[in-house]
Amino acid sequence: MKRLLTLFVVLSVGLTAVGTALGATLDDLERQLQAIQKQIQELKEEKQRQDQKIREMEAAQAAQKEEVKKEAASLREQARRVSSELAERVRIGGYGSVRFEGNSLKEQSNTFTFRRFVLTADAKPADPMQVYMELEFERFTQLELERTTRPQDGGLRVAQAIEGTDGSEISFEQLWFQYDLYPWLKFRTGQVLVPLGRFNINHDDNRWNIARRSLVDRGVPVLPVKSAWPELGAGFLGDIRLGELGKLTYEAYVINGVALDAEVENIAQTRDPRRDKLELEVEFQPSRGTAKLDMKDSKAVATRLAWSPYPGQEIAGSFYYGRYTPQFLSDESIVAFAIDGLTTIGPFEIEAEYVNTHFRNVDRVARSFARVVVDQSANIPSSVSPTFEAEVEFELAGLARNKHGYWIEGRYRFWPEFLTSTVFGKYFENPQLIAIVRGEQVWLNGLVREAEFEGGVLTKLEQENRRLYRVTAGLAYRPTPLVVFQLAYEYTKTDKGRSLAEVTNFLPAQSDEDEAHAILVGVAFGF
């Protein structure tokens, strides 16, 4: 009994301990489970937060991509608008011409001539404003300048070499700004074409059907200087509507104007049995005015008034007046005027121009020139240098008391129907063949042939009267208005027994060559 009681007590105590231990273990487990559940909940919440962040980032990225797309589209649209506006505001164009010439003169070989290439730009900064430019490359292929400076042989050596092609010229034919106040009143300033006659303001090669410019405007010229002739200045132009009477067109400018300017020529010559020669020729002749500091105080004026009763019909008069002597010579002026016109009757056209230029008091200018220059020439005498001669010479050129002349050109436009289906017609809307005849005459009265002076005194002034005429006949093919293929025969004649070289600036005639025959084949194009 006692043992049973003892066993019962022991079991009771053990069971109590086990129960206590089991109770403690369940509490721990419950607490651990709660902790785990809490961690799981926190992880869920963290995942939800991360998912939300990811969704927000994806939304932000999508919004950013959309914004980038919108900005790119906006930039493309802006670029398109700028390109479109630029294309509307700025137009690049130009014209060029090439000629082949066969000539009867002894010293002129058959030759191709790159007449010129002219680059044009026409811009509109705003609706009523315009900027226009023509940059000419005449007979130009290259221009290279080399210069070295270094110590040598106990001193300083400077060497310069210039390489270029004969007759090359780079020139601004036009560069002006225009403000259209009204159709009848437009302000223009810059390098403007002088409106004397019709050719100078319509000189583009691809407008004409003969591959040579006229004697009046270029080959002599009768104009104070050869065309194209721009001057720096300002003025007004415009169109005045006259209702049923057509319209008046005018131009009027104040410009620097023509002036006698120096052209310096270096000549190196070997001679036998005479001494070898190095010559410096300084030739003063009428030249277009400067774009820097004018050589004279007074300015020139030029104006043209044209009446056009119908399209294709025009008659005009123009005038030029201005001092042509620099400030260091006596004050003398040029007076020039021109009459020109165009008439169209069906396929026939007649276009003409007459120009008269008067250089006042050429003899007085020669005396004034002699006083300033003092001696016409100076050289090293043979007693000092028996094998080598160096000479400096001054002379007047291109002056005549009066120059006047005209050209008249008749044209007949036609197109044979059988050519329409050929390569000459099927690619073009309105191809044309044009038969052309041009007649020209020039008179030079009081042309300065020679002026000699010494010690500041004019000792000899030799002047003469000369005449020159030319007839040209040809055929032109125009597939489009901007392109022309030209073929012409040209006959030029001056006073019997006198040289054509004395009265033209393009024919290298010998002293006894008073006439020349030429075949001209040319292409002129615009774009």
Where are the model-predicted features located?
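Bacterial N-terminal signal peptides
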Residues: 8-17
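Bacterial N-terminal signal peptides that target proteins for export
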Residues: 1-8
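Flexible glycine-rich, low-complexity coil/linker segments exposed to the extracellular/periplasmic environment
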Residues: 225, 245, 265-269, 276-281, ...
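Outer membrane beta-barrel
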Residues: 79-260, 266-267, 297-302, 306-315, ...
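Outer-membrane beta-barrel pore domains
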Residues: 103-107, 154, 161-165, 176-179, ...
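N-terminal periplasmic/intermembrane-space "pro-region" immediately following the signal or transit peptide
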Residues: 22-103, 391, 420-423, 453, ...
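Loop-centered beta-sheet repeat module
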Residues: 269-326
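Surface-exposed loop/turn segments flanking beta-strands in extracellular/periplasmic regions
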Residues: 208-218, 271-280, 374-376
